[in-house]
C-alpha cells in the first residue's frame, strides 16, 4: 500500500566520494524515470578534506573538526594558501574551502593538498582524533609528524525526490526520506552534522502520515510481469564496469565543484553517447548512475546561479509551516544542534 524510498544519495557517480559505493542514486533514478518530480540535483556538496589515497573508494573522511582544532591547509610545497580566499583562513565554511582547494589543485596541476597539525601537541592530537591517527598510521602517515594529504570529495546531495512536510513525493503513496529526498531545509549547502533532520524527522513524519491514511488505500490486484522486450544480457561485464568508470571520470572532470556551461554541455554530450551504448542491456548495474548524472546536469544547465538559502530564510518563506518544522526538529532531542569543534 505504501512505498518509502530511503536509498541515499548519488555521490558514487564521482571518482572521489566519502559515501558508500552503493550510493548511485537508484531511488532518485526510479522516480525520475517514472516522471516524478526531482529537484535541486545540482546541489551536490563536496567535503573539502577527504584523505587522498589513490585506489581508496570510498575516501576516508578527515573531519572539519581538525581545522577547528588548528589544522592548516598547505600546498604540496608547504605554503599556506587560504589567505587568498577568505579572512577566516582554514576555518572558512566547507564550500569556500572546497573551492579554494580545487582552485589550487587546478592551477598547480596537483592532485591533492595537505592538512598540517604537526604544530599541535602530539598527545592531544591522538586523544582528539584517535581514528584518524590510526587510519593514517596504517598508510605510513604519522599525523603528529607528517602532513595529511587531502582532496575534496563528493559528500552529500542536498537535492533529490521533492517531498512535502509529510515526506510525500509527487507520486501517490510514495514517500522519500533521508538523502534521496529534497526537503529544501538545507538550501544549496548543508551545514555540518544536521543530515538527521531528513533521516529521522521526515521519516517520523512519513510514518505518521502513512498510518493515518493507510486504510484509505487498497492493494493492486496484479503486478504486471517485467517487460524486457528489446533488451539483452551483456556477456562482457567488463564493458559495463568500464562505462561506470567513464561516468565517474566525466562527472568529476566536468560536473565537479566549479562548473561552466561549456563543461556541463561536454558532460551531457559524453553521457548521452554512453547512455545509448548501454540502454539496450537488461539488469544494467550502472543504469541508475546515468539517470542520476543526467538529472544533475539537466538541472545545473538550467540554473543561472546557486540558490543558497539558509534554514532561517527557508523557514521564513514557509510561514505557518515553519513552526511545525521547528517543533518537529526540537522533538528529537538527540539531533545535534550545535557544532562541537572537537
What are these regions (language model features)?
Residues 1-7:
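Short hydrophobic core segments
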Residues 3, 30, 166:
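Hydrophobic/aromatic ligand-binding patch that stacks against planar heteroaromatic rings
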Residues 7-17:
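Flavin (primarily FAD) binding-site architecture
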Residues 9-11, 43-52, 180-182, 224-227:
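Acidic, glycine-rich active-site loops and adjacent beta-strand->loop/helix elements
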Residues 19-32, 38:
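Thiamine diphosphate
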Residues 30, 36-148, 200, 209-218, ...:
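An anion/pyrophosphate-binding glycine-rich loop and adjacent beta-alpha core
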Residues 74-90, 101-104, 156, 162-176, ...:
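Glycine- and aromatic-enriched mobile tails/lids
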Residues 130-175:
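FAD/FMN-dependent oxidoreductases across multiple families
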Amino acid at each position: 500500500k505504501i512505498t518509502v524510498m530511503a536509498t541515499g544519495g548519488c555521490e558514487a557517480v564521482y571518482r572521489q566520494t566519502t559515501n558508500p559505493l552503493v550510493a548511485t542514486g537508484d531511488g532518485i533514478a526510479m522516480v525520475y524515470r517514472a516522471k516524478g518530480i526531482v529537484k535541486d540535483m545540482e546541489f551536490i556538496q563536496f567535503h573539502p578534506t577527504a584523505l587522498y589515497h589513490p585506489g581508496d573508494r570510498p575516501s576516508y573522511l578527515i573531519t572539519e573538526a581538525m581545522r577547528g582544532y588548528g589544522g592548516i591547509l598547505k600546498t604540496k610545497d608547504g605554503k599556506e594558501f587560504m589567505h587568498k580566499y577568505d579572512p577566516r583562513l582554514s576555518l572558512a565554511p566547507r564550500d569556500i574551502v572546497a573551492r579554494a582547494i580545487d582552485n589550487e589543485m587546478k592551477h598547480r596541476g596537483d592532485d591533492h593538498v595537505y592538512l598540517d597539525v604537526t604544530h599541535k601537541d602530539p598527545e592531544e592530537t591522538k586523544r582528539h582524533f584517535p581514528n584518524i591517527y590510526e587510519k593514517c598510521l596504517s598508510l605510513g602517515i604519522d599525523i603528529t609528524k607528517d602532513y595529511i594529504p587531502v582532496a575534496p570529495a563528493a559528500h552529500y546531495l542536498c537535492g533529490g525526490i521533492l517531498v512535502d512536510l509529510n515526506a510525500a513525493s509527487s507520486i501517490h503513496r510514495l514517500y522519500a526520506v533521508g538523502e534521496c529526498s529534497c526537503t529544501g531545509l538545507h538550501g544549496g549547502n548543508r551545514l555540518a552534522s544536521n543530515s538527521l533532520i531528513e533521516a529521522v524527522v521526515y521519516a517520523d513524519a512519513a510514518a505518521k502520515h502513512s498510518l493515518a491514511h493507510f486504510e484509505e488505500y487498497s492493494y493492486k490486484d496484479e503486478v504486471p510481469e517485467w517487460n524486457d522486450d528489446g533488451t539483452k544480457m551483456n556477456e562482457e561485464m567488463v564493458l559495463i564496469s568500464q562505462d561506470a568508470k567513464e561516468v565517474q571520470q566525466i562527472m568529476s572532470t566536468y560536473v565537479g565543484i566549479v562548473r561552466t556551461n561549456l563543461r556541463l554541455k561536454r558532460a551531457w554530450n559524453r553521457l548521452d553517447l554512453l547512455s545509448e551504448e548501454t540502454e539496450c542491456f537488461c539488469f544494467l548495474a550502472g543504469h541508475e548512475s546515468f539517470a542520476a548524472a543526467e538529472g544533475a546536469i539537466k538541472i545545473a544547465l538550467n540554473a543561472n546561479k546557486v540558490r543558497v538559502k539558509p534554514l532561517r530564510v527557508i523557514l521564513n518563506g514557509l510561514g505557518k509551516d515553519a513552526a511545525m518544522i521547528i517543533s518537529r526538529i526540537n522533538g528529537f532531542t538527540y539531533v545535534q544542534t550545535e557544532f562541537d569543534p572537537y
